[in-house]
Amino acid sequence: MKIVVDADACPVKGIIERLAKEHQIEVIMFIDTSHELYSDYSKIITVSKAPDAVDFALLNQTSPNDIVVTQDYGVAAMALGKKAKALHPSGKIFTNDNINQMLFERHIAKEQRRHGKQNLHSKNNKKRTTGDDIHFESSLNELLKSISS
């Protein structure tokens, strides 16, 4: 088991590394060439800035029972298809029971934006809080315990 992270805009890299160290779990963080990231613990893989390059590199390194941290519902769905666990930086655990609804809602929002309707992203962009970090940490701990038991 390892933790693989879509690290380009991931706000919880520090929490991931701290918990991974405590549980002695490998972490691989994926970024594109427009970002720089250094770590004394995690392996950093830098890929081209091509569309979805980070997503495909991350998924190529994902195995069953890995934990994938991503904000991308499509990546989460593919990770679940590979029998991995998937976790949003908000702490929401993606499951086979909720991913289809999330993908459908993403599709509807995209269609509304395409037709010039209200941008649903802008009104939901709240600043990250300490509570968000606590929720993420709790969810990651939950996944780590479920996999190791």
From Swiss-Prot:
Protein name: UPF0178 protein Cphy_3042
Region annotation (Disordered) ranges: 112-132
UniProt xrefs under InterPro entries: UPF0178
Transmembrane annotation, as ranges: none
Record field: compositional bias (Basic residues): 112-128
Family: Belongs to the UPF0178 family.
